[in-house]
Amino acid sequence: MSTEGGFGGTSSSDAQQSLQSFWPRVMEEIRNLTVKDFRVQELPLARIKKIMKLDEDVKMISAEAPVLFAKAAQIFITELTLRAWIHTEDNKRRTLQRNDIAMAITKFDQFDFLIDIVPRDELKPPKRQEDVRQSVTPAEPVQYYFTLAQQPAAVQVQGQQQGQQTTSSTTTIQPGQIIIAQPQQGQTTPVTMQVGEGQQVQIVQAQPQGQAQQAQSGTGQTMQVMQQIITNTGEIQQIPVQLNAGQLQYIRLAQPVSGTQVVQGQIQTLATNAQQITQTEVQQGQQQFSQFTDGQQLYQIQQVTMPAGQDLAQPMFIQSANQPSDGQAPQVTGD
């Protein structure tokens, strides 16, 4: 082992002074050893013997061998600790760490065999922050679902009712045209209408099932507005839309009376001066009517568009009225 401290500088620390006088002091202790000193060792001899027995070629161990190994291990540990403590003082610390021992092994060639046993704790590089990529979804047509149900839990959009698979009919219309659609009795049929700039309005009307539901249809009617959103993964989510008191005044429901039920969509456009509103009347050849049993209603849907084709930011106007006895649908003008 090395007998030189190898430290420069005018002022030396306590660890450096102890290391400089370490080997002269150790050699003096070895010369002064007696037989009594071999009986008591600072390191337990049982561990030394156990380590020596790990070698399969070792058959017998003499009494002096464990004593010599214990003394050599004591000297080795003391010198390595002094060199590691020097690194601790250089870093203005008072606690010996594992990294100090690793630095002492790295600086001195006599400890090279311990490099793989006591690896140096390298500072881990900071993780790179992953760039957050925001994907812009393409402009998709916004769909609105107006659900008119006899009971709150009686109608489900795109579901099943009374063991029957619901069917949907989709009709594309242009501004100025009128579509009249009516589902069959006993089924829930959503009707989707695309108006102008890619906006779609879907109406789901639940027909009464039997006399028991017809009796409760007068007080159990509810309306639910849902917005359909297409996510980045392609999934379709339906989010309920809450209506305030100002928007609820556009939605009026009447008690079911005897007669027929007609769903009539009418589109109006505003004039250039934004004062005169023209109404597209329902043509006789474009109207479709279906006759049903008693206890049904008349609904009319209106949507106002600007001359440039932009829709106004107002909810749909749905009005329920009784149909005259002559079987003709009344005309409702825009406000």
Swiss-Prot record:
Alphabetical list of Pfam families matching this protein: Histone
GO cellular component, one term: CCAAT-binding factor complex
SUPFAM superfamilies in the cross-refs: Histone-fold
Keywords: Activator, DNA-binding, Nucleus, Transcription, Transcription regulation
Keyword DNA-binding: yes
InterPro entries xrefs: Histone-fold (IPR009072), Histone_H2A/H2B/H3 (IPR007125), Transcr_DNA_Rep_Reg (IPR050568)
UniProt similarity note: Belongs to the NFYC/HAP5 subunit family.
Assembly behavior: Heterotrimeric transcription factor composed of three components, NF-YA, NF-YB and NF-YC. NF-YB and NF-YC must interact and dimerize for NF-YA association and DNA binding.
Name the record gives this protein: Nuclear transcription factor Y subunit gamma
Organism: Pongo abelii
